[in-house]
Amino acid sequence: MSLLLSFYLLGLLVSSGQALLQVTISLSKVELSVGESKFFTCTAIGEPESIDWYNPQGEKIISTQRVVVQKEGVRSRLTIYNANIEDAGIYRCQATDAKGQTQEATVVLEIYQKLTFREVVSPQEFKQGEDAEVVCRVSSSPAPAVSWLYHNEEVTTISDNRFAMLANNNLQILNINKSDEGIYRCEGRVEARGEIDFRDIIVIVNVPPAISMPQKSFNATAERGEEMTFSCRASGSPEPAISWFRNGKLIEENEKYILKGSNTELTVRNIINSDGGPYVCRATNKAGEDEKQAFLQVFVQPHIIQLKNETTYENGQVTLVCDAEGEPIPEITWKRAVDGFTFTEGDKSLDGRIEVKGQHGSSSLHIKDVKLSDSGRYDCEAASRIGGHQKSMYLDIEYAPKFISNQTIYYSWEGNPINISCDVKSNPPASIHWRRDKLVLPAKNTTNLKTYSTGRKMILEIAPTSDNDFGRYNCTATNHIGTRFQEYILALADVPSSPYGVKIIELSQTTAKVSFNKPDSHGGVPIHHYQVDVKEVASEIWKIVRSHGVQTMVVLNNLEPNTTYEIRVAAVNGKGQGDYSKIEIFQTLPVREPSPPSIHGQPSSGKSFKLSITKQDDGGAPILEYIVKYRSKDKEDQWLEKKVQGNKDHIILEHLQWTMGYEVQITAANRLGYSEPTVYEFSMPPKPNIIKDTLFNGLGLGAVIGLGVAALLLILVVTDVSCFFIRQCGLLMCITRRMCGKKSGSSGKSKELEEGKAAYLKDGSKEPIVEMRTEDERVTNHEDGSPVNEPNETTPLTEPEKLPLKEEDGKEALNPETIEIKVSNDIIQSKEDDSKA
């Protein structure tokens, strides 16, 4: 249609004889996105002299590299490359003829910008604790709507008010921390075009280094080949790099320094004095750096250079010296090992005997009026704040002999050997001698006197044969410190005095318990038992009952009921039996009916119940029988009666009913009558729920034993057959060889061994002679009845005993004021603290 219109207009012009201009542009309106290229063709009808293009600002367009105008006859083409927003507007195409007349046409160019992301960097890194701004520059025309998403949730909906969108569409995170790391999505939308685009941005939070140094101060000793390791751990993100500095210089690994674990450990080797000082650990990463300092203090450890053992004498004085060196100068402490008591410089004991003085690493411990308790080990400890050193010395105290035992009086009698012990301690050890009347014992004419040395003891064994052997003996001990002696007395022993306070404390038809008091004097020799004599009043024969040890209580058994008895008590020591006590009379109880029996029960096997009878008071006559009556409690059954012999200790009730309660009455009978009945009630358990009998439940004991023997024989046969085929031995192999006429050398040897053994048993076997001793023949301790060693030819029959003894647990006690000591027909009153038996 437009073409026809053009030809029509052309015809009009030709016919009129005038050339009219007419301008057209191929496009009247164009939309173009930024960055796209477009061209427009302008056509002039007529005889144009020129065709020009004008930009929206009215300026004539001159060709450039981006905007190009090309003219081809009556056409002119405008090309715009890589259009931008500024290119938008109305472009005019103007044609001019020779007469200067112009015609023009216009085209409207609209330029829009697609969603464009500029300067979007991923990842974006921030420092922990700062206010972060995540940059996302997005543009379009019209302006886009921008939103941020984190974990598929818009940040504007997150309750954390640290997140906010800025006016420039960037995301702000206040006080960002490590937990905020992740992927954030920047999304742009153009509603008019339905256009959407996004960019995922990785946000990384860098944490500045934080150094952890578990120990900052170190002590080391110089010139000892020691080494010290510093530890420096650093946390942060990214992982910090650790380096060490000393005096401002970087430490590198060499013979002096060792670096381990990514420089987390620094070891200083062969420490010397100059190695002391600060060591700086520095940790660095993108977020910053941190440093901490470790300090190495190098000291000379204390060392004791002089300490030696000392020897002094009792009541003397001595000075103990301890010298030590070190840097810093150490303090010296003394410690007495025996009691753990410590002394430091300036200390003084309460009694003023011990005093410590010292200065500049030297200490002196001075002791005056030396006591034996001061002897022993002394520890010297030199200590400073970097360590310590300890050594020990020994203080030896020499002293004159000391007699340990306080017992100086011993008792014996003619024909009874006794050992007198002279126990001496001394330093140095003393020489010990026995004397009597200035005569050193044993003398040639004193065959009944012998001496034995056992360590620090010198034992004098005396076997008295006459009154002359009783009297004073002297023990003398000597060393280079001094001489000491002690006098001992061998006194003539006597039999004990009579016990008193005899009484009956318990009484029955056939027994009586007798109690009495110990005698006032045991005669100088310990009492080893008491003798209680008992007889019926009408009888002349006394029965003797011996006490157990020195117990002052004796039980008399097998007495006749309702009978009057007489008793008397005498004490017996090594010398012999003492005087009897005053005779006491008592009467046993008459025979009566037994007391009610005491019963306790428990279920027995099956439908039976076991009633156990506790030993009871039989009234003085043996129990002849028990009469048992029982019946069920749940119904009015008649009583069933059962009699059991009196020597039985239990009763079995059989054929009872499951879960049934029973009532039992038990009466005991002796020859005088019946006791009151004892009532006992019990209930039977429910019937057992037996699911299945096993094989062995159905077999008797003999069958089970038979099966066991058969199994054992089967195992032996299998073992013998295995030995036959594997090792060519066993019973089967023996039978085979005998049947085949073979005989091994080992069999001959075995036979010879058997024959030799038989000959030995026949000719040389003799049973050893074993000496048997009954319980009554055993030697017992007279004090508590325990076994003791039997006396030999050098052991006296009596043991020395300290006086006085405590009156407790049945042991003998002797009042020293009542003892007379017989010495060579003289009477010597013993002292309370020296009288020892």
Curated annotation (Swiss-Prot):
Gene Ontology CC: axon; membrane; neuron projection; nuclear body; plasma membrane; synaptic membrane
Paired cysteines (S-S): C42-C93, C136-C186, C232-C281, C322-C380, C422-C475
GO BP terms, alphabetized: axonal fasciculation; neuron cell-cell adhesion
One Pfam family recorded for the sequence: Ig_3
SMART domains linked to this entry: FN3, IG, IGc2, IGv
Location, primary (coarse class): membrane
Residue span(s) of domain Fibronectin type-III: 498-591, 593-688
Ig-like C2-type domain: residues covered: 21-108, 113-202, 208-297, 302-396, 401-491
Topology, Cytoplasmic side: 719-837
Compositionally skewed regions (Low complexity) per UniProt: 789-798
Protein name listed in UniProt: Neural cell adhesion molecule 2
Classification lineage: Eukaryota, Metazoa, Chordata, Craniata, Vertebrata
Underlying gene: NCAM2
